[in-house]
Amino acid sequence: MIDEFVYVDGKKYRRGYTSGSCACGATKAALIMLLEKRNINEVRIGTPKGVDLDLKIENISRGKDWVQCSVKKDGGDDIDATHGMDIFARLELVQADQVPDFRSDLDSDYLFITSGQGIGRVTKKGLDIRPGRPAINRVPLKMILKEVQETLDEAGLDIYDYLGGRKILVTIFAPQGQEIAKRTFNSNLGIGGGISIIGTTGIVEPMSDEGWKKALSAELAIKRAEGREAIILVPGNIGRDIMAKSYGADLDGIVKMSNFIGYMLMETKRLGFRKVIIGGHIGKLIKLSGGITNSHSRVADARSEIMVANLALLGAPLELLKEVDACLSTDAMVDIIRKAGYSQVFKVLADKAASKAKVYMRLGQEDHMDIEVYLFSMDGSLLAKSQI
C-alpha cells in the first residue's frame, strides 16, 4: 500500500500505483532473488513521478536460472477494473536463440521483454505500440530497463561477464487478465487477449481524468489511422445508440467523449479529421451552446440559464421563461417548450453549439473542418440539427 495522498474538492484521497509499476517491481524483485539466491518480501522502485514505491512481493517460485513473482495492483482510492489483480514477472537467463520474436520494442541488447497469459496484444495502428506487439507501454519498459541496469550495477557485476552470452528474458503475465480486460477500454483501443501494462508516471492519481482522456484520445487516433476523415462524438451510450439506430451511423465511426467535449474536439483537430459530428441528448450538449466544454455537473451546469436566455431572445413570454426555469430536467423543459410552440429554440441551440465548437477549436478558413451538431430528446427524437 502506498501512503501518498492528494486533496480533491476538500476530500483526502490515497494515491495508487500503475500496472507498469507492478510489472517493474516484480521484475526487479525476481532479478534480486536470482542474483542473491534468496527470497525477498519487498522491493523498492523509483517512478517517473519522483515517488519511490515499496512493493510487497508475493507468489514466489524459482528454478536454476529463473525466478517469478508478483505484485498486487493497488489503485488507491481510484478503483478501476485492475485493482487487486496480481501482475507477474518471470525473469530467466536464456540462450540468444531462445528469445521469442513476439516481444516488446526495447533499446537493449541483453534484456528482452515479452508477455504471457492475460496480457493483451496490439491489433490496430494508431497506438504508441506497433501492431502485433505486447500491450506494454514505453514508460513501463523504460522503468524495467532502468531498474534492471541499476540492480546489476549495485551488485558490482559486469553484465556481459555475468551473462556469458546469455540474455535476460522477462515475461509479464496476469492470470486474471483476459477476464478483467472485458471490463476495460481495451477492445475499443485495438488490444485483444488481455490487459495493458500502462502508466506514464508510475502513480495512479485519484479522481483524475487524465487516464480516461488518454484512452479516449487513443481510440480517436486508431480511427484516424484507419483512414477515417469523419468522426462522430457522443457523450455516452444514449447518443451512440441513437446515432446508430436512427441515423444508420457506423458504430465503428462513433467515439464516446464522456464529459470532455473541448478536449476531444481539440484532439480531432490535432489528428486531422475533416468532419466532426457531435450527437447526443440535449441535456449534455446544451452546455456547449453556452460555451461550456466540460459537461460534468460539478464543473458547470447552466442548462436552465442557457435555455431561458435563448427563449427570451426569441421573444418568449415571461411566464414561459419562469416555467422552464423551474424545471428539474431538460426533458421537462423540452415538453413545455414544444407545447408552447417555441421548438425553434432547439435549432438556435444546435447552431450555437456548432459555432461555439468552432470558436473553441480556433478554426480558420485554412482548417477545412466541418462541425455538425445533432440534439436529441431522451426518446431518441431529433430536436434539431445545426446548419451553419
What are these regions (language model features)?
Residues 100, 124, 181, 242-244, ...:
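Generic domain-boundary/flexible-linker signal
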Residues 2-7, 14, 189, 195, ...:
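A structural signal for small-residue-enriched, beta-sheet-centric alpha/beta enzyme cores
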Residues 1-183, 187-189:
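Generic N-terminal targeting/processing segments that precede catalytic cores or assembly contacts
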Residues 378, 383-388:
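C-terminal, non-catalytic interaction/recognition modules in large multi-subunit enzymes and RNPs
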